[in-house]
C-alpha cells in the first residue's frame, strides 16, 4: 500500500513538472520586442513584391548589408515583421532600440539608432516611411 502511494505521488509530481515546463516562455521569434538571430551580411530575407536594401552600422563600427523582400507598406512594418527592429511605441512613432540584435538606448548609453534613406537623414520615422522599391535604408548607432 505504501509503495502504491509513493508511486502515485511520484507520478503526480512528474506530471506537474512536465506541465509547468510546457508553460515556459515563447521563442524569441514570437516576441516582436526581442529580435531573432541577427541577419548575416549579404543575406536576403522575407517574401514579397517590394525589394529594398538595409544597412546596419553598430556602435563598434561593424556593418552588415542585406536585402529585404516584403509586401508591407512601411519600412518599419517590414522590419518589425521580420524581427530586424524592435522598440517602444511613443506619441512620435516607434522609438527603435534594437536593430539586427544590437540594442542601443539613449537613456542608458547616450546613443540612438539614426535612420537614413538613400544616405540622407530621414525626415520621417521608420514606421512612417513608405517603402520605395530599390531604396537603401540605413540604421547607424550614433
Enumerate the predicted regions with their spans.
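Ubiquitin-like/PB1-type beta-grasp interaction modules and other compact soluble beta-rich domains
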Residues: 2-12, 18-142
